[in-house]
């Protein structure tokens, strides 16, 4: 029983807050643009057009636009994925934004 309690405690201790924590609204903005970029990449891939340059340049432009690095983005993705309720809020907001775009 004690082992079970300790293992549960360890899981919660692994959730670390990034040095630069992006707000939910910032994550919604960024994730919306990530989905648009990924769809552009997948479209080109479907047309058998090289996507390496688009992917590299696209993410570089996206991170520059938001004033973040890839490390900040991925640290925040880890943080939000480790907090399912926060990530659900972000993704629900992203979906709502796309619904408004239709």
Q: Over which residues does each language-model region extend?
A:
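C-terminal motif of bacterial Sec signal peptides marking the signal peptidase cleavage site
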Residues: 4-7
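Preference for short coil/turn "hinge" residues that link or interrupt alpha-helices
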Residues: 14-15, 61
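Post-signal peptide N-terminal segment of mature Sec-exported envelope proteins
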Residues: 16-37
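Bacterial signal peptide processing site
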Residues: 9-12
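Compact alpha-helical subdomains of small soluble proteins
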Residues: 42-102
